[in-house]
Design a protein with these regions (language model features):
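Cleavable N-terminal export/targeting peptides
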Residues: 1-46, 64
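Short glycine/proline- and aromatic-enriched beta-strand/turn motifs that initiate or cap beta-hairpins
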Residues: 36-84, 88-92
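Transmembrane beta-barrel strands of outer-membrane/channel proteins
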Residues: 51-57, 77, 86-88, 108-112, ...
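Transmembrane beta-barrel domains of outer membrane proteins
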Residues: 54-56, 76-78, 97, 140-144, ...
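Extracytoplasmic loops and strand-loop junctions of Gram-negative outer membrane beta-barrel proteins
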Residues: 55-58, 121-124, 153, 207-213, ...
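Outer-membrane beta-barrel transmembrane domain signature
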Residues: 81, 92, 158-240, 244-252, ...
Length: 274
């Protein structure tokens, strides 16, 4: 089970996608893992590998930027100590068994996020200084039960571009349909501090023009909801799919760089496990 993950973080879009891509990438992959049998002690010490290719279509929040459609190479490596998938690596910490049906998992995560923009990306960004993505690191916790799964994650910008912090939380439940198909609705919230919002959506004094007033970002919380699915043909071949909608916080919508109140993303991929 993986509720939260970086970022996403795979292309140069706004920071609001970080939780989204994580759901559509890492979450999709680990859902497929759940279809397989639970590993015994001997199997848990081995390393599993997976390779694949996906495509994502996402609506950007910035004015004048349409949908961003791009291929996504997929690489997965997992054993009892680490889980690497896409732009994120998790270093697993000891878990806590609360009962036969409840477990707490902990981890240290590092992920790359490609958020940001260049001034040539849209007319509204002409004359703006480049906003860069970078590496984020932090800790995560996941509580799993028979009824619902909960995840929480704290991340900090270790690249020093925004010098910001994020807190992501999410709830999900997975339904099995036969032996091959999983469907997982999920909801979540992503809090971003004032430094993060100001870096990606603020307008500095030297960037002001007649249709782009100065804007200082404040901390904000986006609300996200979506569904992902995994169809596993056998233990090697899986098809991954996902859809997510994000309601942007007022602190983002009020930016003169933004012309919408929601964003959305659609994902489809194929993964081969060795």
């Amino acid at each position: 089970m993986s509720l939260i993950s970086p970022l996403d973080s795979i292309s140069s879009a706004s920071v609001s996608r970080m939780a989204a891509v994580s759901v559509l990438a890492v979450g999709l992959c680990t859902s497929a893992t759940a279809l397989a049998q639970e590993p015994n002690d001997a199997e848990s010490s081995t390393t599993t590998w997976g390779l694949g290719l996906g495509v994502m279509s996402e609506q950007e929040p910035y004015a004048g930027i349409g949908r961003d459609n791009q291929p996504l190479p997929l690489l997965e490596v997992e054993n009892r100590y680490i889980h690497l998938f896409g732009p994120e690596i998790e270093f697993k910490l000891p878990s806590l068994d609360i009962s036969d049906s409840q477990e707490l998992d902990f981890g240290i995560v590092v992920q790359y996020d490609g958020s940001g923009y260049e001034e040539g990306d849209a007319d509204i960004l002409d004359g703006m200084s480049e906003r860069k993505g970078g590496f984020w690191a932090g800790a995560k916790m996941e509580w799993s039960s028979d009824f619902v799964d909960f995840g929480a994650e704290w991340l900090a910008d270790v690249s020093g571009n925004s010098k910001g912090q994020l807190i992501n939380v999410g709830l999900e439940r997975t339904w099995d349909f036969g032996e091959h198909f999983l469907l997982t609705p999920h909801v979540g919230a992503s809090w971003q501090d004032a430094k993060t919002i100001d870096y990606y959506f603020g307008v500095r004094d030297d960037e002001v023009r007649f249709d782009r007033p100065a804007y200082a970002g404040e901390s904000a919380t986006n609300i996200e909801a979506g569904v992902r699915g995994v169809y596993m043909f056998d233990k090697h071949h899986s098809v991954l799919m996902g859809v997510e909608v994000t309601r942007l916080a007022d602190e983002i919508k009020d930016s003169p760089l933004v012309d919408r109140s929601t964003t959305n993303s659609v994902y489809l991929g194929y993964l081969y496990r060795f």
